[in-house]
Amino acid sequence: MNLNGFNEAHLAVQQGPLAAPVLGRVIGMLAARAGCPIDRLDDALLITDAVAARAGSFSDDGRIGVHVAARTGVIELNVGPLRENGANELIASAKLPGVGNILERVADEIAPERTTAHEYLRIRMAFGTPRPSGSVTMEEPDAP
């Protein structure tokens, strides 16, 4: 955990059969630390699969970096460096027939970002604040 309260991981990913499983496990681990509910974990894994399957096609050499940051209620991925307009191309490539665009449907925010030298895609998912452990989830019966 860093000083800002984030759990972070930096991965270098090359397109191939291990990209999705490795990235998925890292996302799963950090999502658990962030208190991610199971339904949103499934959404995060859909995003992971889309990034692992397609992002390398939009880089100069088939490799990308993925920076994952998680804290209670939020998971954020920064994907890149991508080639010029690669972030928009990556977003467009996530469209599936009959389903629509996976990234747009399940992420709370997707935003191409540019530094002076590179382009990145920021993908953010937010979810409700988890209940503290040991909290009462059912109403207590009235005392007689």
Predicted regions and their residues:
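Conserved beta-strand-loop-beta-strand hairpin that lines the nucleotide-binding pocket
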Residues: 1-10, 54-144
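Bergerat-fold GHKL ATPase/HATPase_c domain
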Residues: 1-46, 133-144
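Conserved ATP-binding N-box helix of the HATPase_c
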Residues: 37-63
